Amino acid sequence: HFVRRRQRQMCIRDSKISDNQGKFRIYNSLLSEYGVLGFDYGYSMATPNSLTIWEAQFGDFSNGAQIMIDQYISAAEDKWKLQNGIVLLLPHGYEGQGAEHSSARVERYLQLCAKDNMFVANCSTPSNLFHLLRRQIKLSYRKPLIIFTPKSLLRHPHVVSKVKDFTDGNFKMVIDDFNIDCKQAKKLVFCSGKFYYDLYTVRENRKIDDVAIVRIEQLFPLP
């Protein structure tokens, strides 16, 4: 807060700043997903060699920018032959935040997918997310990238990567299960994102050794 009132005296934080220390300005700007995503889309269009990322506070909030997503991000290349490499980070998952703070509406984005118009991903490891962003800027062409990013994975003890996982390799569209002997596996489960860690925990707790769990990291184009 700029002005503190919950004390004996009101405190204005810049009252001790002298004239030769520069200017300090506070603006109560409009909270508009539509406006900011529109600006970032234009910025990405004007600077195709920059990695422009727009992150929603929660994935649900992207509905405030639906016009930009429907008319530009998903369709501009087909309609106007305009490529754009903007990245959308959409927090997604039932993680105790309540209504309108839980779902990035994965199904809506998949319904917009056609003719390789954009990338849609749901990464499960830090290194794979790194390589996905790296691939986005290293490609010789530009496509929008939609990434679902559960907040619970930020501090999950199992969601870690070794240094060599960042320095070596590339983005993996599919991650195989190396914890199960393929000769013993009787069932194969395909999943994506944070579901892997839920399934992995259950498998470990129940000591199941005949179920393999394969992660699909890129949802579109499907590997």
Describe the role of every protein-language-model region.
Residues 32, 126-129, 218-222:
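Short acidic loop-to-helix transition motifs that present clustered carboxylates
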Residues 14, 23-76, 80, 93-113, ...:
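Non-transmembrane, aqueous-exposed alpha-helical and coiled segments at domain scale
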Residues 27-29, 53-54, 89-91, 121-123, ...:
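Generic beta-strand/beta-sheet core signal
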Residues 196, 201-223:
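Generic long, charged, amphipathic alpha-helical segments
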Residues 1-12:
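Single conserved hydrophobic/aromatic residue that forms the stacking wall/gate
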Residues 16-24, 48-53, 88-91, 113-114, ...:
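Gly-rich Lys/Arg/Thr-decorated short loops/hinges at beta-loop-alpha junctions or inter-strand turns
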Residues 82, 95-195:
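Active-site phosphate/pyrophosphate-binding segments
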Residues 8, 86, 118, 145, ...:
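Short, conserved active-site loop motifs that form the nucleotide-linked donor/cofactor pocket
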